[in-house]
Design a protein with these regions (language model features):
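Bacterial N-terminal signal peptides that target proteins for export
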Residues: 1-8
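Hydrophobic h-region of N-terminal signal peptides that target proteins for export
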Residues: 12-20
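Right-handed parallel beta-helix/beta-solenoid
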Residues: 19-49, 64-66
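The right-handed parallel beta-helix/beta-solenoid scaffold, focusing on the short coil/turn
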Residues: 23, 58, 74, 80-82, ...
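N-terminal extracellular ligand-recognition/capping segment immediately after the signal peptide
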Residues: 48, 56-96
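Short glycine/acidic-rich loop motifs that flank beta-strands on beta-rich extracellular proteins
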Residues: 71-73, 94, 108-109, 114-116, ...
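Right-handed parallel beta-helix/beta-spiral solenoid domain characteristic of secreted/periplasmic
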Residues: 82-170
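Right-handed parallel beta-helix
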Residues: 86, 131-144, 159-171, 187-203, ...
Length: 285
């Protein structure tokens, strides 16, 4: 009984800490420096630096720019539950994700240091059911990281042909990235909204969630491979995960292989979880 009470008290204190001690950090690729304090007036230069400084529950406000990752590796590792909010201008006086583009858009050359999992990799399962993550106002884009055939599958008027799958490659030095745009292992509440997922070399969003809610709302998925959004329960008990996929536009998902053998799905309702798919535009997957 004493141990049960102690565990309950610890959970309450953890929730209180996440909510009451949360801080705001600012990141601007154009005007920031990593030795800055991370304030609105003196922002960090890179997202990875802000994540290192942040505590669980903090919010990162991120100005326009194509963020290269640590040592320009081409991807971001998020190892604690924080909120990433993009779409600000350089001095954070205005926010409009349609105007101020906060991007994770790796190049083909960065495939030499490509991620194991995703261009945004989130591994926060250990923080438990009281954690919250929001990803808001980002452009995730593998167009430059992919390798397209110069002729095969080339529609009239287009610059390139079909996506090539490693080890094959087109005219680029390296094969396509073949990784997810966003790969996450999470718990608690996980929300993705107001984002663009473009030309993903693998899944656009691949999420294993242990308990709680996943909400993917008001996003655009265009030209990704495999699947637009695949959310799975990693909990052995049924009914522990609620997944909502709403008000998204999801078009032109490509198959796993050139021969159209499988995949090419928009969004999937997986086993042992509650899935609510509504008010979306889904076509040509």
């Amino acid at each position: 009984m004493k141990y049960a009470k102690l565990g309950l008290l610890s959970g309450i204190l953890l929730t209180f800490t996440f909510q009451s001690m949360a801080a705001d950090w600012y990141v601007s690729l154009a005007t920031g420096k990593n030795r800055n304090q991370g304030t609105r007036e003196a922002p960090f230069k890179n997202i990875w630096k802000a994540i290192e400084k942040a505590a669980p529950g903090d919010t990162l406000h991120i100005a326009a720019g194509n963020y290269p990752g640590k040592m320009s590796c081409g991807w971001i590792n998020m190892d604690k539950p924080v909120n990433l909010i993009g779409g600000y201008n350089a001095d954070f006086s205005a926010r409009d994700p349609l105007v101020y583009h906060t991007m994770l858009r790796p190049s083909n050359a960065q495939n030499t240091t490509k991620p194991i999992f995703g261009t945004l990799t989130i591994k926060t399962r250990k923080f438990g059911k009281n954690s919250n993550i929001l990803i808001d106002g980002f452009i995730f884009d593998h167009t430059l990281a992919n390798s397209y055939h110069p002729r095969e599958g080339k529609p009239e008027g287009f610059e390139h042909g079909m996506l090539t799958i490693p080890p094959a490659r087109g005219t680029t030095k390296y094969p396509s990235i073949d990784k997810a745009l966003l790969n996450a292992e999470t718990d608690g509440t996980f929300t993705i909204r107001n984002c663009l997922f473009l030309n993903g070399g693998n899944y656009a969003v691949l999420n294993g969630h242990f308990s709680g809610k996943v909400r993917i709302v008001n996003n655009v998925f265009i030209g990704n491979r495999m699947m637009g959004a695949d959310v799975r329960s990693t909990n052995g008990k049924p009914g522990m995960v609620d997944f909502e996929f709403a008000n998204n536009t999801l078009l032109f998902t490509w198959t796993r292989t050139k021969a159209f053998e499988d995949m090419g799905f928009g969004v999937r309702a997986n086993a042992n979880m509650s899935t609510n798919i509504h008010h979306n535009i889904i076509g040509l997957n």
